[in-house]
Each structure stands twice: as C-alpha cells, then as structure tokens.
Design a protein with these regions (language model features):
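Beta-propeller domains
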Residues: 195-273
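Structural signal for beta-propeller blades
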Residues: 40-43, 101-103, 144-147, 201-204, ...
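Bacterial N-terminal signal peptides
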Residues: 7-17
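Beta-propeller fold detector
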Residues: 54-64, 114-120, 158-169, 216-223, ...
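Aromatic- and glycine-enriched pocket-lining scaffold segments that form the walls
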Residues: 137-214, 219-227
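Conserved beta-strand positions in repeat-built beta-propeller and related beta-rich domains
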Residues: 34-37, 87-88, 95-99, 138-143, ...
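Short loop/turn segments immediately following beta-strands, especially the blade-tip
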Residues: 45-54, 105-112, 149-158, 206-214, ...
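Beta-rich, blade/repeat-based domains predominating
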Residues: 26, 64-86, 121-135, 167-191, ...
Length: 280
C-alpha cells in the first residue's frame, strides 16, 4: 500500500506467532511493545527513525506475569485489543499482567520508562485498558467479566472504591479465546464506557460514566449486528466502528444518549475472522 488507510483491519489467520500489544508515541518517535511472557512480562521500547526503522532502546519489566487464554489464542494470547495503552498526554503507559491479575503504570520519559506502581486488576485475567483524562478502566475477561475503575495519579493507579461492575459472563480463568470479552474503551467525550463480549453474548455493552468516575449499575446490552464483536474504534463523527469476527465484518453504529446503539451499517472485508481495528 502506498498510503495509510483510515481504518486498519487485522484477521487472525493472517498472523504468525504471538500478536504483541503495541502502543505508539507519535510525537517522540517511540514504540512500546508488551512481551506478555508468562515468566515475567516486559515492555520493549524502540526508537523509530524517520524511515520507519525501529531500534531497541531498552526493556523494562512490568513487575507482573503475562497470560495465555485457553486454546485457540495462538495468534493473540490475550484475546483482546488495548492491553497496552499510552495516555492521551503521552506521560503514562499502562500494561495488563494477565497471568498475575495485576496492572502496571509507568511514567514515560522519552524512550525510558519509570515504574510507578503495580496494582490488583480487580478481577481475573485483565486483558484491555481504557483511559480518559485521569480515569482508567480495566477489563478483566476471566470469570464473570469485571470492569474496575482507577484514578491515574502521579504515583500511579489508585482503585476507585465501588467502581467494579460485572458483565455477568461465565468464563474460566484463563478464559476461552472466543468467549473472552474483547475490548473496553471510552467514547471520545468520556461519557460512556463500552465493552465487546465476543461470543459470550455477542453484545456491545454500554455503561454511563458518572461525574465521580463510577459507572451505571448495569450496562445497556446491545446485540451486535453480526456475531462476535471483538474490537472497536470511533469515527470522526463519533459513530462506533466495530470489528465483528463472526462474519469478518465492520459495522458502524450511532450511539444514543441512553446507551442504545442504532442505525447499524455493516460491510464484510471478504476475509476470515476480523479481529483488530484501528483508526488513524
């Protein structure tokens, strides 16, 4: 391809080996890659040259363990999108440690990382992270599926009391690739938190976010237009853009003020098992 497409789509069958989690600091030309090793999770930091070439600048342990979802996850051991996230201001990097049920917060200093703290994820098998301003939510994809809230401070992550919410799932620990929830993220304005449940319920769950950082007691459960909603991003007009693996389709939705998704428009990519999606 000669140009970057607005949406980048990824199918599991096109990949070989483990899919690493990647966060990119475009301003400083630094790329962060999570190794997700069960013996000890680490972040590899690369400097990116003007020609796109990467040079390893350092490796930084997270203080936790990587994890592997149940069989079927050979190309994506965490079965998710968003397991390594750079804060919008580029000053913090947050990584999940699925094998030890913890989350790590780093301070970013160019191509160097300073570990701030390692905290309990509030559930089993943390696999995805969402950040909006100083509010962080972690998706735990094992067990019933717990989303846990944190405040992001200078010294790291601090759990918000009473912020945990369950998705009411019935996964193991580790979860199965197909039934593990795929992603958590905020709407661009931070007013809602969305979770995709993949084949567990084939739904996109939408929570309201209160001014105190806590979520509504239960989400609005929206059936996906096509089966197995995996990952998502947002369009320029605020529409949800979801990758749905069951039919290898991309579907856009309007997000209502009450959390209901409407006006679905789907298009297959002509491939198999579309999983990850990213908008530049």
């Amino acid at each position: 391809m000669q140009k970057y497409a607005p949406l980048l789509l990824f199918a599991t069958l096109a990949l070989v080996g483990t899919q690493p989690a990647v966060a990119q600091d475009r301003g400083s030309g630094v790329v962060f890659v999570q190794t997700n090793e069960p013996s000890g999770n680490k972040i590899d930091v690369f400097d990116r040259g003007a020609d796109g070439r990467l040079t390893l600048a350092g490796t930084f342990p997270t203080g936790g363990l990587g994890g592997v979802a149940a069989p079927g996850s050979e190309s994506d051991h965490l079965a998710s999108q968003g397991s390594l996230v750079l804060s919008p201001d580029g000053r913090a990097l947050i990584a999940v440690n699925a094998g030890s049920d913890t989350v790590t917060a780093f301070r970013v200093h160019g191509d160097r990382l300073q570990l701030r703290n390692v905290v309990s994820s509030g559930g089993e098998f943390p696999a995805s992270v969402a950040v909006h301003d100083d509010l962080v939510y972690v998706l735990n994809s094992g067990g019933t599926g717990i989303v846990q809230g944190f405040q992001l401070r200078g010294d790291g992550l601090v759990a918000i009391p009473g912020s945990a919410r369950t998705l009411g799932l019935a996964n193991g620990d580790p979860p199965d690739f197909l039934t593990a929830p795929g992603q958590v993220d905020f709407t661009p304005d931070g007013g809602k938190l969305l979770v995709t449940t993949k084949a567990s319920t084939s739904s996109i769950d939408v929570f309201d976010v209160g001014t105190d950082g806590r979520l509504s007691a239960s989400p609005v459960v929206n059936p996906s237009a096509t089966p197995v909603p995996f990952a998502f991003t947002f369009g320029s007009q605020g529409r949800l853009v979801a990758g749905e693996a069951g039919t290898s389709s991309v579907t856009t939705y309007a997000i209502g003020t009450g959390g209901t998704l409407s006006d679905p428009k789907s298009q297959s990519d002509g491939q198999v098992a579309l999983c990850w999606i990213h908008r530049r």
